[in-house]
């Protein structure tokens, strides 16, 4: 795939368990491919799984009206971008003069797409709905929906992406000494901003 993520070695994440958890917790992704000679992107939920060969895959679907749907038949290479928490880091939080920066977590997943049959697409929808209905007080199930409602499933293109490569980055002020690192965490926690606090928690886990 022609798009790559710039990752300084200090911020590279190669912990497979962490990456899998990150994808599971931040499943709303951007699916990118080449469509009609241009890069095309769609925001969709994707879930991590394994295929019958035991290989890791991402499962999802898009509308049949989306130009990407037709392009998958000609070009099976895709990129899924997963973004996590992020926050501004003020240089006023350091004990020395420096420039501000931004801390964040991100994962790029590269793979080859395979379109599902209608039967497979129903199974895919079940997995997606079951995952996100799990916290609902009255969870719905695909199996319980009427035939009329399920006709809408004919309007989607379901697929799985066999993962060929993963690039993961966690930029969490790893270049700072312990004193400044701890102060960044403290200042982030004072903001009462959910994103900032999430980054503070990630920093605590990282050192």
Please tell me what each predicted stretch does.
Residues 1-5, 118-207:
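C-terminal edge-of-domain segments
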Residues 6-30:
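Short, basic/aromatic recognition patches
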Residues 20, 98, 148-151:
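A generic local secondary-structure boundary/capping motif
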Residues 25-64:
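Short beta-strand segments
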Residues 25-26, 74-75, 191, 206:
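Structured helix-beta-strand junction loops
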Residues 27, 42, 54-58, 74-78, ...:
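A generic structural signal for short beta-strands and their flanking turns/coil linkers
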Residues 45, 61, 81, 112, ...:
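Residue-level recognition of well-ordered beta-strand positions that form the cores
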Residues 65-123:
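Short, structured beta-strand-loop surface elements
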């Amino acid at each position: 795939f022609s798009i790559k993520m710039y990752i300084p070695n200090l911020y590279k994440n190669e912990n497979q368990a962490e990456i899998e958890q990150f994808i599971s917790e931040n499943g709303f992704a951007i699916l990118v491919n080449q469509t009609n000679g241009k890069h095309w992107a769609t925001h969709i939920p994707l879930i991590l799984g394994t295929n019958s060969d035991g290989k890791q895959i991402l499962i999802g679907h898009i509308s049949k009206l989306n130009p990407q749907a037709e392009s998958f038949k000609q070009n099976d290479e895709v990129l899924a971008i997963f973004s996590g928490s992020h926050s501004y880091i003020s240089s006023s939080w350091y004990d020395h003069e420096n420039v501000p920066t931004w801390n964040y977590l991100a994962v790029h997943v590269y793979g080859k797409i395979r379109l599902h049959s209608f039967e497979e697409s129903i199974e895919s929808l079940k997995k997606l709905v079951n995952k996100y209905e799990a916290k609902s007080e009255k969870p719905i199930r695909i199996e319980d929906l009427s035939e009329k409602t399920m006709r809408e499933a004919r309007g989607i293109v379901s697929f799985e992406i066999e993962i060929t490569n993963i690039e993961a980055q966690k930029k969490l002020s790893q270049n700072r000494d312990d004193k400044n690192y701890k102060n960044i965490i403290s200042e982030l926690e004072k903001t009462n901003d959910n994103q900032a606090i999430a980054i503070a928690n990630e920093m605590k886990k990282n050192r």
